[in-house]
Amino acid sequence: MVAGRKAFALQAGDALSPDKPAEAQPAQVKTDLAANRQDAVFRYAQNGVQVTKTITLHPRNFKVDVRTEVRNGPAQVNMLFPGLGKADNPRVQAVPVGGQPASVQGSGTLSVQNIQYAALQENPSQIAHALIVRPQQGTKVDVQLTGGPQGLVTATLPATSSLEVYGGKNELIHLYQSGYTELPGLFQPNFFGQISLLIVKLMEALYKVIGNWGLVIMALTILLRLVMWPLMQAQGRTTARMQLVQPLQKEIQEKYKGKTDPESQRAMQMEMAQLMRDYQVNPAGCFSTLLPFPVLIALWATIRNFEFDSGFLWLPDLATPDPFYILAVIYLFVNLGQLYVSTRKTPEMFRQQAMIYLVFLYFALTFPSGVTLYIILSTIIGIVQQIIINKQVEHETASLGQTVQKVAPGTRPASKTTVTKTIDAPKK
């Protein structure tokens, strides 16, 4: 937990010292599959003092329970929690019961009585770590916080004590799964962190019903797409109408081909603008394509840090990339299918953009498999939505005689300023 450090070392004057020899017994390890826990019992004697430490490991998080019993020794002992391995100048903090956080970073010492918790923390990031100590079962703990390059928490405990110790990432999802996000002053999530918390709570609620993390991600994907369905309509309708007007835009460009004088260029721009108005193409509708990205970023941060207790199908861990690259292949074909649906009337655009998805294939190879699963299913739902919208838009224009196929070659719905009007554009 703390590489190269004597964590959980006891100290009490000459009676107990981590630097003096002790008579130690072989550790006893007991696994309780029903309770999903593992206990390791360590016993040793030093200067006539007998010490028993029981350390309980819990799956899916980075915390252990440390129960200590000291016999024939002093009424109080010190337990040392020295630094965070190679971390430099961590923040050393403690919060007394009913009080406010007190911290030291850099030089200096600080004493805090009757703590709710004490912590050594690096600045939050994906590679930052934290060590958090919480008294359990009514144990009263006083601490001395020592700042400096490594930092030190010295906890004063009764001879019989119980602590919960977290040693892992100083990151929101890990802390949440270990039950520490509610501790005052420990961690303040940002905007994406708040979204991540909502996602992980929804995932846990779905898991209680479904009981499979892969199916939970799929159900979450469907729910999110249903919520975003109305918002994605504007983008879908813009895409469908753009497919209808692109051939007409090319006709206008051909009409003014080779004409570089300002008047011709201005006339071409006016015809282009009128064409967009006639077919009710709203470029602002494309902004809705940005809506899924905050959710995707938050979901990516959630899944890659989430501790899953089981895999899904051939995937051993939904928080890691697919080791067999099957999802990456599916991802590529699904995205090409989405591109085809969006550019089916302009094959040259499909060919131009198809190569871009080979670049995106890299992300499918490196993303957590749970995130790739979300993207694949979300894209499939998006394809279905776009097909429905395409049919709706074609039906709307066809009912008014406005499909591109019904526009004679070399003609288009004329603008309101054109003297000879061919076919009115659809009006709503």
Curated annotation (Swiss-Prot):
GO cellular component annotations of the record: plasma membrane
Topology term for the membrane: Multi-pass membrane protein
Chief subcellular location: membrane
CDD domains: 5TM_YidC_Alb3 (cd20070)
BP GO terms, sorted: protein insertion into membrane; protein transport
Compartments (UniProt record): Cell membrane
Superkingdom assignment: Bacteria
Gene Ontology molecular function terms on file: membrane insertase activity
Keywords: Cell membrane, Chaperone, Membrane, Protein transport, Transmembrane, Transmembrane helix, Transport
Pfam families on file: 60KD_IMP (PF02096)
Transmembrane regions: 209-229, 283-303, 323-343, 356-376
Alphabetical list of InterPro entries matching this protein: YidC/ALB3/OXA1/COX18, YidC/Oxa/ALB_C, YidC_ALB_C, YidC_periplasmic_sf
Quaternary structure and interacting proteins, as annotated: Interacts with the Sec translocase complex via SecD. Specifically interacts with transmembrane segments of nascent integral membrane proteins during membrane integration.
NCBIfam families named among the record's database cross-references: yidC_oxa1_cterm (TIGR03592)
Role, per record: Required for the insertion and/or proper folding and/or complex formation of integral membrane proteins into the membrane. Involved in integration of membrane proteins that insert both dependently and independently of the Sec translocase complex, as well as at least some lipoproteins. Aids folding of multispanning membrane proteins.
Sequence similarity: Belongs to the OXA1/ALB3/YidC family. Type 1 subfamily.
PANTHER family for the chain: CYTOCHROME C OXIDASE ASSEMBLY PROTEIN COX18, MITOCHONDRIAL, OXA1
Listed name of the protein: Membrane protein insertase YidC
Species in which this protein is naturally found: Deinococcus radiodurans (strain ATCC 13939 / DSM 20539 / JCM 16871 / CCUG 27074 / LMG 4051 / NBRC 15346 / NCIMB 9279 / VKM B-1422 / R1)
